[in-house]
Amino acid sequence: MAAMPPVELGAILFVAYAAVLISRGPLVNRVVLSQVDALQPKRQFTLDFLLTLVAGVLASIYNMLMLEFPITSTLSLLIGCLMGGFFLALDTALEREREIIFKTLEMKKDQEPPKHLYSMTRKFFLAALTSVLFFSIVLVLVFTRDIVWLAGLDQSTHSLSAAQMAVAYEVFFIMMVMLVLVINLIISYSKNLKLLFSNETRVLERVSQGDLTGKVPIATHDEFGIIAGHT
């Protein structure tokens, strides 16, 4: 599949993602918005991750049936779709959580502290671990393919030098893509943290001035929700 023109591969992926995108709207209403606020971010992540997986499977099936690629050749495509889907699903889940935070801040109703805690440290750990695993798997696949490719090259100095530069550019491109995905995730999560911190500090400032009527709405079911519930 490495010999496939990028335009052709992009067209196949575009059609596969467009097919699942058509069904996303109704599925969001049925699977995500029909649930209570506390479950919506998790449902959003699961839905978008599975939709991305379906798109990757559709593209892989097309490559195997129509272009007669072997299963092992489409494995890298499927893993790439899974990695992209993981970061995309995290971003949409954070966006869903941000919408819930805005809605909760506007409602300003009395709420009980969350009984089931979804720890922030655990979510950080799982996200970081999964990111490292995906990055490692992609690098292993790239290096394995490049080793096979280098073994079949002419052993002249010019050929080896050109091959080394090609491998270096490939690894650099992968690292840049991963960096962009991680930075986007950090920015998205920072927006949520800013909302939670600003609301908490605003109420605490009013308390320091003697105003005890302020309340911190419970917008999440993590440590911030516990703090808000007892403030």
For the regions a protein language model found, what residue spans apply to each?
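Cytoplasmic juxtamembrane amphipathic helix immediately C-terminal to a transmembrane segment
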Residues: 19-35, 91-106, 186-205
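Cytoplasm-proximal transmembrane signaling helix
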Residues: 163-187
